[in-house]
């Protein structure tokens, strides 16, 4: 068989001279195209990042509060210090939660403006809507954990009160304790308390301490009650579309990954086989 390598190399050089820009599409420098929505997306990204950071800090505070509540129930010393720390964390959670809620409302307005200006199917509208739903759900989850921590602390206090009542010889159910808590009739425990019964007196002191803790818990829960209502309305509006958004985001990630893989294969194929196209045209010559 005749060696035709020299001819193929000559044809390759001729082809490069005839189409100088055809083989360098991947390596040629490109100018970035500035779209009208770029500034909006940058502003939106900053808002999203800010809310994400605040949600993370809120979740950290909520879990700190849970640990403080456990310390309050198990520790026998420094109770006043633990109470101060717990109240301080609860106030920080309330303030941060209100700030996140306000930022979510602003983001919602920004999303609606983008949709009205660029259309519901534009990239900026879809991105803002999807991110808003995800951030609102994260905020809801953090506040749900906060509510669970406070309710658990409340139940634990009631259990401790019930145990101390048993020490005093008073057998009461959880419902009876709840009724007495709501009515504020705690003085009935001291009516038959004898001065020489130190155990009963200590039990009464423990009951009064847990009662005060319950009052503080009720106050903290009342403080964030309005925030919980606003959050419920905020998230309820997103429930119908949330699953669809998550599915579309996942599909987009899958398609993007597949497209990147195909592009890499194409680039490698072109670099390794510069003469393959020419060889196809030269097949009749082999015969």
Swiss-Prot record:
The principal localisation class reads membrane
Q: Which domain of life is it from?
A: Eukaryota
Hey, what's the signal peptide range on this chain? Answer: none
The cross-references to Pfam families, in alphabetical order and at most eight, read: Syntaxin
User: Record's PANTHER family?
Assistant: SYNTAXIN (PTHR19957), SYNTAXIN-11 (PTHR19957:SF30)
GO BP annotations of the record are:
cellular response to type II interferon; cytotoxic T cell degranulation; intracellular protein transport; natural killer cell degranulation; natural killer cell mediated cytotoxicity; neutrophil degranulation; T cell mediated cytotoxicity
Transport listed as a keyword: yes
Record's subcellular location: Membrane; Golgi apparatus, trans-Golgi network membrane
Q: Name one GO cellular component term.
A: Golgi apparatus
Which family is this protein grouped under? Answer: Belongs to the syntaxin family.
How does this chain sit within the bilayer? Answer: Peripheral membrane protein
Which parts of the sequence belong to the t-SNARE coiled-coil homology domain?
A: 204-266
InterPro entries cross-referenced by the UniProt entry? SNARE, Syntaxin, Syntaxin/epimorphin_CS, Syntaxin11_SNARE, Syntaxin_N, T_SNARE_dom
- MF terms per GO, please? SNAP receptor activity
**Has the keyword Phosphoprotein been applied to this entry?**
no
Outline the subunit composition. Answer: Interacts with the SNARE proteins SNAP-23 and VAMP.
The protein's job, in short, is:
SNARE that acts to regulate protein transport between late endosomes and the trans-Golgi network.
Q: Which UniProt keywords apply?
A: Coiled coil, Golgi apparatus, Membrane, Protein transport, Transport
Q: What is this protein called?
A: Syntaxin-11
Coiled coil (residue ranges) = 41-71
């Amino acid at each position: 068989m005749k060696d035709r390598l020299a001819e193929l190399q000559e044809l390759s050089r001729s082809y490069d001279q005839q189409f100088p820009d055809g083989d360098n599409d991947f390596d040629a420098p490109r100018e970035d195209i500035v779209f009208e929505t770029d500034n909006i997306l940058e502003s939106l990204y900053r808002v999203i990042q800010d809310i994400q950071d605040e949600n993370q800090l809120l979740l950290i505070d909520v879990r700190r509060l849970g640990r403080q509540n456990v310390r309050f129930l198990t520790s026998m010393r420094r109770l006043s210090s633990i109470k101060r720390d717990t109240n301080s964390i609860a106030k920080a959670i309330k303030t941060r939660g209100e700030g996140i809620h306000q930022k979510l409302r602003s983001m919602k307005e920004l999303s609606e403006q983008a949709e009205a200006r660029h259309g519901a199917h534009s990239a900026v509208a879809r991105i803002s809507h999807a991110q808003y739903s995800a951030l609102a759900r994260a905020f809801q989850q953090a506040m749900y954990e906060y509510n669970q921590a406070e309710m658990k602390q409340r139940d634990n206090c009631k259990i401790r009160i019930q145990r101390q009542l048993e020490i005093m010889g008073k057998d009461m159910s959880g419902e009876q304790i709840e009724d007495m808590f709501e009515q504020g009739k705690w003085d009935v425990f001291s009516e038959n308390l004898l001065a020489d019964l130190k155990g009963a007196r200590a039990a009464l002191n423990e009951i009064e301490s847990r009662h005060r803790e319950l009052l503080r818990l009720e106050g903290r829960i009342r403080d964030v009650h309005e925030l919980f209502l606003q959050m419920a309305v905020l998230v309820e509006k997103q429930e119908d579309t949330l699953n669809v958004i998550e599915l579309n985001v996942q599909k987009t990630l899958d398609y993007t990954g597949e497209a990147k893989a195909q592009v890499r294969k194409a680039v490698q194929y072109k670099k390794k086989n510069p003469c393959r196209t020419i060889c196809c045209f030269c097949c009749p010559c082999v015969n």
